[in-house]
Amino acid sequence: MTTQLEQAWELAKQRFAAVGVDVEEALRQLDRLPVSMHCWQGDDVAGFENTGAALTGGIQATGNYPGKARNATELRADLELALSLIPGPKRLNLHAIYHEAPEPVGRNEIKPEHFKNWVEWAKANKLGLDFNPSCFSHPLSADGFTLSHADDEIRQFWIDHVKASRRVSAYFGEQLGTPSVMNIWIPDGMKDITVDRLAPRQRLLAALDEIISEKINPAHHIDAVESKLFGIGAESYTVGSNEFYMGYATSRQTALCLDAGHFHPTEVISDKISAAMLYVPRLLLHVSRPVRWDSDHVVLLDDETQAIASEIIRHDLFDRVHIGLDFFDASINRIAAWVIGTRNMKKALLRALLEPTAALKQLEENGDYTARLALLEEQKSLPWQAIWEMYCQRNDAPAGSQWLDNVRAYEKEVLSQRG
């Protein structure tokens, strides 16, 4: 007997076909766009170094919801549940502080073997891995400077950390058969009026050049650099500004990372994608939700998330844009946060793929802006949810809010035992 879901699917297929959209092709294209989930939502960016260091770098995870992961075993178990509730291809994004070295190791001495468990787990779960050096929450970043530090020894420590991180990233790519995108973000900046804004940027430029001087196979590893407007304790000056990294990525042909929360509240990264793509080979997107500042709230299916997805699809940037998530909310169930945010990103991509873009572009070229606006608004109410639910069913993921039942059961059976 035909189920209600299948009936809705057939009717939705007809509705989209009427506006020239092939929904089966849309689903095939959706599978070309893995979303890289960030491991740090699971433990509030604590990592496994167990030094007791506070979270620094001008970032903040607020809330104290019970049950956060305390070690790699718990974090991977939580991730496995989240992954099972999200349809389609995924990746996992790791920070360097999530290594599993058997003994304490300096960040400048991390090695691929310290991440062997993650690689084996990724293979078992059919995931690609991405990576990040961790230039925060460390005694040598306590004064707010890392790669741009005026002290040669401290700066070299962080240079060596990022160099070591690139080798870990390349190991991921080599082992998993898909390049690891390694993003370099540093918190460097000053709280108050800064007299010499040039020297730290000169040091950062030289440090980055030294870091990327070691040639690595791009089939295994991709370098990305990320700007930021400000952070807590660095309100007046950020060394790695948008202009700095746009210039760096353009001149060195690295990937450029655009984080949705790293600009002025009235700026949106969806508007930056098409401009940046003219000058850099690749973009890494950190999709987040800034509320008045870079608060890293859970991603919603809101206008900006949709606009980001639409830019990727409309300009056929499948092979040049890498989609990552970057939020950390400790006030709600952390597994639910992963599921909500990642499903929303995938929903936005699907909705973009279901848009009759060719027809809309033709109206725009013809100067018929009335019809363009009318059709843009009408297509919002087309039955995309029926397509989403079929996609979930085909990928053995819950179609609707039933996924929350799985999370609640796990919370009762597992998370509640963590204290």
Curated annotation (Swiss-Prot):
Lineage top rank: taxon: Bacteria
Cofactor note: Binds 1 Mn(2+) ion per subunit.
GO BP, sorted A to Z: L-lyxose metabolic process; rhamnose catabolic process
Cofactor(s) the record lists: Mn(2+)
Compartment list: Cytoplasm
Primary enzyme class: isomerase
Catalysis: reaction(s): L-rhamnopyranose = L-rhamnulose
Main location per the UniProt record: cytoplasm
GO molecular function, one term: L-rhamnose isomerase activity
Enzyme Commission no: 5.3.1.14
InterPro entries to which the protein is assigned, alphabetical: L-rhamnose_isomerase, Rhamnose_isomerase, Xyl_isomerase-like_sf
Matches recorded under Pfam families: RhaA
Family designation: Belongs to the rhamnose isomerase family.
Primary role: Catalyzes the interconversion of L-rhamnose and L-rhamnulose.
Subunit structure: Homotetramer.
The protein, known as: L-rhamnose isomerase
Protein source organism: Enterobacter sp. (strain 638)
Gene: rhaA
